[in-house]
Amino acid sequence: MNVNDLKQRLSQAGQEHLLQFWNELSEAQQVELYMELQAMNFEELNSFFRKAIGEFDRSSHQEKVDARMEPVPRQVLGSATRDQEQLQAWESEGLSQISQNKVAVLLLAGGQGTRLGVSYPKGMYDVGLPSHKTLFQIQAERILKLQQLAEKHHGNKCTIPWYIMTSGRTMESTKEFFTKHKFFGLKKENVVFFQQGMLPAMSFDGKIILEEKNKVSMAPDGNGGLYRALAAQNIVEDMEQRGICSIHVYCVDNILVKVADPRFIGFCIQKGADCGAKVVEKTNPTEPVGVVCRVDGVYQVVEYSEISLATAQRRSSDGRLLFNAGNIANHFFTVPFLKDVVNVYEPQLQHHVAQKKIPYVDSQGYFIKPDKPNGIKMEKFVFDIFQFAKKFVVYEVLREDEFSPLKNADSQNGKDNPTTARHALMSLHHCWVLNAGGHFIDENGSRLPAIPRSATNGKSEAITADVNHNLKDANDVPIQCEISPLISYAGEGLEGYVADKEFHAPLIIDENGVHELVKNGI
């Protein structure tokens, strides 16, 4: 260990405080800290900090972006409800691409389930479905089913490779989970794990924070760290070697995600796009989601906090919100575009500043848990690269068909939790049964008066205000119904199981057939 050399580097960067407890450390602790610090480029970190804080200060004092915003023009927008006559063509295009082994999916799975009250990766979470499948298993089975559908339509076996970006904290447990479950039926060589980078937390004056005497406080560098990670681990080269042309990028916490959605992929390809965003219609002006729009003519996501209430409330002539393209971290990239981002544009991306309460060791060596923000974490966002697209498109889908994020524990505010995720999936599957000609009956044999949401699968323009308003039983809970992704990817192919049949809930349809679970032993 060349400690003097390290001391000099730290001194030049104004970070010499990181060795203030050096003489108190055991030899093993010294080695640990030395290795951690040796791996850091302090000049680069200081530069990141200066730029991030400069941008943060500028945006804090700037007016809102309202005057510079324009909504997504109709010509770059595809809609699952307003473009029904084209859905079949888009789906056929997507399935054709999949059948030629040209499509891969990229999962952003770096998040731990901290807000869910668990210490393991979010993808390993079970929201309490009758099958008790985890998010990872549901997504894996959707990939398997889509491979089968493409094969059925085109007659040749195909593969959808699955690239999974984890963080340092979730990598090992994620890999172990997949190994334990035999990759959920997927071939091991087609599931590629890679790790996003980490950045140290810094105080407001640019000093790297120690969380222990021998340990720097580190945090993942945001889902936009994807691009740096792709470069560091040669992932784009792997995609090229496999002949991949299109990538579907999505976030692990959406239980309804249509992984490698052939309609979305087909739409983007037929539009000649190099980059696309899937969005849901924002119907409530105060919903805290970012919106996809143009600012100064350039596509980007504008966060809810960046626009005034008056702008958020503006409506177009058809009554919809003017800025209604709600971002759901669900994107399409071509591989050449991704390659350009990784090799050319990534260094131009700005870090965003998140002010945080960061536990630290003070100069006396005491561990402090602050009660107000004392520093920043720097992160990039996956959507920051929209600005570099040559042809950007937006695909709007129904929230109740495709978006129910899992962010909070059930004990929290009643939104985006295991119960809402479970209910969203069961409501959707209930619709599928009704649309395929099945019926539900109560314990007396009377048909339940549930009307299917006709909007499912883009069959009507009717959009309901409350996702589950007519799909609940007397206890205001959706009818329990779960259909395995191995049976149906998006509601197709169910007629043989349910047409003209009556079912008691709970109903499960899986590869072993149709099961009506008996409640309370009756």
Swiss-Prot record:
It is found in: Cytoplasm, Cytosol. Monomer and homodimer. This is UDP-N-acetylhexosamine pyrophosphorylase. Belongs to the UDPGP type 1 family. The lineage of its organism: Eukaryota, Metazoa, Chordata, Craniata, Vertebrata. The gene is Uap1. The keyword Transmembrane does not apply. Pathway: Nucleotide-sugar biosynthesis; UDP-N-acetyl-alpha-D-glucosamine biosynthesis; UDP-N-acetyl-alpha-D-glucosamine from N-acetyl-alpha-D-glucosamine 1-phosphate: step 1/1. UDP-N-acetyl-alpha-D-galactosamine 1 binds at L108, G110, G111, Q196, G222, N223, C251, V252, G290, E303, Y304, N327, K407. Keywords: Cytoplasm, Immunity, Innate immunity, Nucleotidyltransferase, Transferase. The keyword Ribosomal protein does not apply.
